């Protein structure tokens, strides 16, 4: 990433990608994304703003839980309607004064453009009509430095449309203007370096000139854009030709290809690094997601969306950028860029094998530049590449001027020089600089910063291509070559100037590196320990994206949660590069996110870069020095040889010649032995003052030489000496000596040559041995690789076999399982069929049994119908007889009434006669009259009672009866009051309390005995009355009085007090309290209750025997006893001694109840109540099991029960017949009392089933003991006649 603070786009990349349109000026998407079709309907700015509604409701879909954290209640207004804040206005606009000052100082301002002025197109179309950029604004990279060197004065409008921004929408504000500085504050230096940033754009030289000449201000901008649209992207890229866009400048649009760092192998292309500082421009023109080392640029966004870097203090490029400044790209690569060469892509995988030790992606790019050259040279070793003519023809083909051609050639040679110094292990050697063609440099390119002395490899460096012109050096191919002295001097001077200029340029680079290093160290020292940059952390996620910044607490939490591995690349905001978390923990001695002293910022590879730079410059300096030395020696050697051919040399000259030869041979030996240039370190900065000429005389002059150089050779050799002979002798001696020295020198040279050849042979042998070893190593590795592949193949086959066996076993197991499942399914199906058959058989058996039961039921029904018909016929006969009897009774009553009327008529006549007789006897005296009356009364009483006496007797009897009734009522009321008091006491103690105090309430047995005594008394009284009636012979009067008495006593429903006592006893001790025989505390199931049954039955018999003349009373008593017996049967069971059917049932059940889990008496009483034969069979089967004995028992049970019912019906009919016969034997008053008693009983019994004595009822309803319930279901006994129907007969 560029070293300067680069403006980033605000907003995610996918949003910018989706904003891409189909027009020419729209930005291209990333290569993997498809093109998007334009919408059919597009709206202008005003139309879209008119569609905005403030009161628009939130869509219902957004109200779900997942959208609630990001949901905002109020809609945001469009940005076009929101005015700029002060900070945004300050960021996006420049003041006129600062722009003018910068323009005067030559620092940009858009190359002389007015701030905010439109460039080529009008920006005054309003606040946008297209797809406006709402969020991502750019800002000049060096805003904080006060240098607006990128023409960053374009005024930003929030609603500027895509058309208004042109294809500059993703670039930073204008770059590459005339006065642009390169990171330094010094104006002249930056102006001088201007060419360096653009020299390598061989295809864009016309564009650059047009822009320099100011065409960028007018139509040139537009023309350049349209001219270069078709040639911007590589035609062989996977996505084909691309449209223009991204943040690339118009003048640099052709030169870039993307270098997706982690996707080089997937893509078929990559961006070649451009040389010199123009790489910075390239990087600025690319989106930040496709730049290398994106982690070097960290920062935040302010409220306006502008990017704020955390490294504002860094004004110098990082070492990676310095290396790029130091290494211009070679023309061959530029050519490959334009000629669509795939060589780089084909050789690109080799770079990783050679550059594993380096951490940055820089080395990978360098290797990709060097690999094609290596393969090219290996294809033709020893053959120098005639690259210069190719370049010349290429440049002529592109109509490039000579000056640009020379600049390109020098740029290439310089890059080769840097590369050979950068990679010294490749055996590069230097040759004399005279091999550089002596082309005169144009004055406009003779800047000291642009001249380099190129190294050329010797034939021994077979692994490098010879990139410079293959011109033989003087004195190497033919000794007779005579270079022109002036031309050689001129060329030598030019080369020396080039070398000095390059050294000055390197000195400037070193100064910049040193200042950057010092600045970094000063920054590291000056940052306080708790500085914000030390508290902010960034890390690279597995996708290679940089996340951050995060504070220490967040990073510590995530580290403790286990999200971070030891290999995670992290760095602080103040660090230069990322480091693995494990390395940082080792260096710091603790978890870096925990609190503690923070180490100084990590400088990255600055020291390493500085050392590398020093080694490069030292090696380059040595090479230049050796080249220069060799060139001088060759020149001197050639001149001496030429002079030797013309005239004999003096001894001094011969000595000089021998010394030159010796130096030349030594220098040749040095060069041949120097396979690796020593990395001699020197000072960081070489003085840019002084010349290389100050260094050379001491190294190149011989000690006996008086001149400073070969040009200072003595010119007075022809001067006259003292004497010619002496001079001739001296010359002969000198010639002999010189010849001897020459022979010695030749011998020495031969020895040295042989030594050199031997050494070269030895070196060649060593190289051969090394090559063989490498070949053997390679073969061994290939064999090992082959063996490993074979082993892997064997393992793979073994695994495949194992997998096949496992699959086969699994298949067999699956088949076995399927077979087992199939067998199970068949077995289950068979069992299901068998079960269905059994079910069918059972159903058939049940159907057969059902049919048999239905037949039996039909027979039973026929039998029952026959019995019912017989009973109906008997009932009809009885009804007919009864009707006849009633008719006879009515007839007899009519006769009686007629007789009574006759008697009354006779009595009236008799009374009239007596009154007449009394009136006739009024004449008698009173005494005699009374005496007569008494006598007559006595006589009458003796003879027959008179009517008045009969009436008196009747009245007296009635009065006695009423008194007796009142007395009984008083006793009854007393008993009721006592019972109520006891009940109240029991209620106070709680209704659930079982314990009851022994009260004075009479039991049912005592009440029945008392009633029986009262009935006996009443019968005796009736007998006495009947005797009196018989004595008085007034049967008719007695009958009349009995009838009158029974009518008067209708409340109690009887002629005597017996019914009233019975009714009272029912109130006192109802059927619910009859269970308490002797003690009220005893429950219903106590033993005392069991005695009630037989006693009641005996009492019933006694009552039936003793009350034969009072049928109404006895009938009522019988009903009460029957109800009690039913209760006892229901809860206690029928008396075993009385019922043979029950005894048989119990005997059979005891025999059948083998499991001893059945309560036999309860089951017998329950079965008796079940009427349906089917239910009897079901219950028998359920309780006794589905056996033949149980079925036989049920069948016999039904037969015996039917017989018993028939017998019971017959007995009841006989009893009813007897009762009816006894009823017919009584007089009409007794019959009337019986009917009245039955009616009152039916009215009083709420839970009693009303049944006529003549009709048969299947099942009679009985009362249950309410003490089992815990509460009373009847009305309170305190309230008399509650719930009973009162009739007129009751009064």
Curated annotation (Swiss-Prot):
Gene3D superfamilies noted in UniProt: 3.30.1490.40
Keyword Phosphoprotein (UniProt): yes
Annotated transmembrane regions: none
One of the protein's GO biological processes: negative regulation of type I interferon-mediated signaling pathway
Post-translational modification Phosphoserine, affected residues: 19, 26, 30, 140, 161, 190, 237, 594, 995, 1276
GO terms assigned for molecular function: molecular adaptor activity; proline-rich region binding
Keywords in alphabetical order: Acetylation, Isopeptide bond, Methylation, Phosphoprotein, Ubl conjugation
PANTHER family: GRB10 INTERACTING GYF PROTEIN, GRB10-INTERACTING GYF PROTEIN 2
Subunit structure as annotated in this protein's UniProt entry: Component of the 4EHP-GYF2 complex, at least composed of EIF4E2, GIGYF2 and ZNF598. Interacts (via the 4EHP-binding motif) with EIF4E2; the interaction is direct. Interacts with ZFP36/TTP (via P-P-P-P-G repeats); the interaction is direct. Interacts with GRB10. Interacts (via DDX6 motif) with DDX6 (via RecA-like domain 2).
Protein name, entry field: GRB10-interacting GYF protein 2
């Amino acid at each position: 990433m560029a070293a300067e603070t680069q403006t980033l786009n605000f907003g995610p990349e996918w949003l910018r990608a989706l904003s891409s349109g189909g027009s020419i000026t729209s930005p291209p998407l990333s290569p993997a994304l498809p093109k998007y079709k334009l919408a059919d309907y597009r709206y202008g700015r005003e139309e879209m703003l008119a569609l905005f509604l403030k009161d628009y409701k939130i869509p219902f879909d957004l109200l779900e839980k997942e959208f609630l954290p990001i949901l905002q209640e109020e809609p945001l207004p469009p940005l076009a309607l929101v005015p700029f804040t002060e900070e945004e206005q300050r960021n996006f606009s420049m003041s006129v004064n600062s722009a003018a000052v910068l323009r005067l100082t030559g620092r940009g301002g858009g190359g002389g453009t007015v701030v905010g002025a439109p460039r080529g197109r009008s920006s005054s179309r309003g606040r946008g009509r297209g797809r406006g950029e709402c969020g991502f604004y750019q800002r000049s990279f060096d805003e904080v430095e006060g240098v607006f060197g990128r023409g960053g004065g374009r005024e930003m409008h929030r609603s500027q449309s895509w058309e208004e921004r042109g294809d500059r929408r993703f670039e930073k504000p204008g770059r590459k203007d005339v006065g642009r500085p390169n990171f330094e504050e010094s104006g002249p230096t930056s102006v001088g370096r201007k060419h360096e940033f653009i020299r390598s754009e061989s295809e864009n030289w016309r564009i650059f000139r047009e822009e320099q000449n100011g065409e960028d201000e007018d139509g040139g901008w537009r023309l350049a854009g349209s001219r270069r649209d078709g040639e911007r992207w590589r035609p062989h890229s996977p996505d084909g030709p691309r449209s223009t866009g991204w943040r690339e400048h118009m003048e640099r649009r052709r030169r870039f290809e993307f270098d997706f760092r982690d996707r080089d192998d997937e893509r078929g292309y990559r961006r070649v690094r451009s040389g010199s500082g123009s790489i910075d421009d390239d990087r600025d023109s690319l989106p930040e997601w496709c730049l290398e080392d994106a982690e070097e640029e960290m920062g935040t966004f302010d409220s306006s969306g502008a990017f704020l870097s955390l490294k504002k203090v860094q004004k110098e490029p990082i070492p990676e950028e310095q290396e790029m400044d130091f290494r211009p790209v070679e023309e061959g690569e530029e050519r490959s860029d334009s000629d669509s060469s795939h060589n780089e892509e084909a050789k690109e995988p080799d770079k990783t094998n050679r550059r594993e030790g380096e951490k940055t992606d820089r080395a990978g790019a360098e290797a990709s530049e060097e690999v094609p050259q290596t393969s090219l040279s290996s294809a033709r070793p020893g053959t120098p590449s005639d690259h210069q003519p190719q370049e010349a023809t290429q440049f002529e083909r592109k109509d490039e001027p000579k000056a640009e051609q020379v600049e390109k050639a020098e740029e290439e040679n310089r890059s080769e020089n840097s590369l050979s110094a950068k990679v010294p292990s490749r055996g590069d050697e230097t040759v004399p600089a005279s091999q550089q063609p002596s082309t005169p440099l144009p004055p406009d390119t003779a800047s000291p910063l642009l001249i380099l002395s190129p190294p050329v490899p010797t034939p021994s460096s077979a692994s490098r291509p010879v990139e410079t012109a293959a011109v033989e050096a003087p004195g190497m191919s033919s000794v007779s070559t005579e270079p022109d002295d002036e031309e050689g001097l001129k060329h030598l001077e030019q080369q020396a100037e080039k070398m000095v200029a390059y050294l000055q340029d390197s000195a400037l680079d070193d100064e910049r590196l040193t200042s950057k290093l010092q600045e970094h160290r000063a920054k590291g020292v000056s940052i306080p320990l708790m500085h914000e940059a030390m508290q902010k952390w960034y890390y690279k996620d597995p996708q290679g994206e940089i996340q951050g910044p995060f504070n220490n607490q967040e990073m510590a939490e995530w580290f403790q949660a286990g999200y971070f591995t030891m290999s995670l690349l992290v760095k602080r905001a103040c660090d230069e590069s990322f480091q693995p978390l494990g390395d940082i923990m080792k260096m710091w001695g603790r978890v870096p996110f925990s609190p503690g002293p923070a180490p100084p910022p990590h400088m990255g590879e600055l020291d390493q870069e500085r050392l590398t730079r020093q080694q490069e410059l030292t090696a380059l300096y040595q090479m230049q020095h050796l080249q220069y030395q060799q060139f001088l020696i060759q020149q001197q050697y050639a001149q001496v040889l030429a002079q030797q051919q013309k005239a004999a040399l003096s001894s001094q000259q011969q000595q000089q010649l021998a010394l030159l030869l010796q130096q030349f041979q030594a220098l040749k030996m040095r060069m041949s032995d120097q396979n690796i240039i020593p990395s001699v370190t020197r000072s960081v900065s070489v003085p840019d003052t002084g010349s290389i000429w100050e260094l050379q005389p001491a190294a190149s002059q011989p000690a006996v030489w008086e001149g400073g150089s070969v040009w200072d050779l003595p010119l007075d050799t022809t001067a006259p000496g003292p004497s010619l002979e002496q001079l001739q002798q001296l010359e002969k001696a000198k010639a002999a000596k010189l010849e001897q020295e020459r022979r010695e020198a030749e011998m020495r040279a031969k020895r040295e040559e042989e030594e050199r050849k031997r050494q070269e042979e030895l070196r060649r042998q060593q190289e051969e041995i090394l090559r063989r070893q490498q070949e053997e190593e390679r073969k061994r590795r290939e064999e090992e690789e082959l063996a490993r592949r074979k082993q892997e193949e064997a393992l793979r086959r073994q695994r495949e076999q194992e997998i096949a066996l496992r699959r086969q076993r699994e298949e067999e197991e699956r088949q076995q399982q399927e077979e087992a499942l199939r067998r199970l399914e068949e077995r289950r199906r068979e069992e299901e069929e068998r079960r269905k058959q059994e079910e069918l058989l059972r159903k058939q058996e049940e159907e057969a049994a059902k049919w048999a039961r239905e037949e039996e039921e039909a027979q039973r029904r026929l039998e029952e119908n026959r019995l019912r018909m017989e009973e109906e016929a008997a009932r009809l006969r009885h009804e007919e007889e009864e009707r006849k009897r009633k008719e006879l009774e009515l007839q007899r009553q009519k006769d009686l009434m007629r007789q009574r009327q006759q008697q009354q008529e006779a009595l009236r006549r008799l009374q009239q006669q007596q009154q007449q007789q009394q009136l006739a006897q009024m004449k008698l005296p009173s005494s005699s009259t009374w005496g007569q009356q008494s006598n007559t009364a006595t006589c009458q009483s003796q003879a027959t009672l008179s009517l008045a006496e009969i009436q008196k007797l009747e009245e007296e009897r009635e009065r006695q009866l009423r008194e007796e009734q009142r007395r009984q009522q008083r006793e009854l009321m007393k008993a009721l009051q006592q019972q109520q008091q006891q009940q109240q006491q029991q209620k106070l103690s709680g209704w659930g309390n079982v314990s009851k105090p022994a009260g004075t309430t009479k039991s049912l047995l005592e009440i029945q005995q008392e009633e029986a005594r009262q009935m006996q008394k009443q019968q005796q009284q009736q007998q006495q009355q009947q005797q009196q009636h018989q004595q008085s012979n007034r049967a008719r009067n007695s009958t009349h009085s009995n009838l009158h008495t029974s009518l008067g006593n209708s409340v109690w429903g009887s002629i005597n007090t017996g019914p009233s006592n019975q009714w009272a006893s029912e109130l006192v001790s109802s059927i619910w309290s009859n269970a308490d025989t002797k003690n009220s505390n005893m429950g219903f199931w106590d033993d005392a209750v069991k005695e009630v049954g037989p006693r009641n039955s005996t009492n019933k018999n006694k009552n039936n025997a003793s009350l034969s003349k009072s049928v109404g009373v006895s009938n009522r008593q019988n009903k009460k006893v029957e109800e009690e017996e039913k209760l006892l049967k229901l809860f206690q069971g029928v008396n075993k001694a009385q019922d043979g059917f029950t005894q048989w049932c119990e005997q059979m059940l005891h025999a059948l109840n083998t499991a001893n889990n059945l309560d036999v008496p309860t089951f017998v009483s329950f079965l008796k109540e079940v009427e349906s034969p089917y239910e009897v069979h079901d219950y028998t089967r359920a309780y006794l099991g589905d056996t033949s004995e149980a079925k036989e028992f049920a069948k016999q049970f039904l037969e015996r029960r039917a017989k018993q019912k028939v017998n019971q019906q017959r007995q009841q009919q006989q009893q009813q017949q007897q009762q009816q016969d006894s009823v017919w034997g009584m007089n009409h008053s007794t019959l009337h009392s019986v009917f009245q008693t039955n009616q009152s009983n039916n009215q009083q019994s709420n839970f009693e089933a009303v049944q006529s004595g003549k009709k048969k009822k299947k099942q009679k309803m009985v009362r249950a003991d309410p003490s089992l319930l815990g509460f009373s279901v009847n009305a309170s006994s305190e309230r008399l006649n509650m719930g009973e129907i009162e009739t007129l007969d009751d009064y």
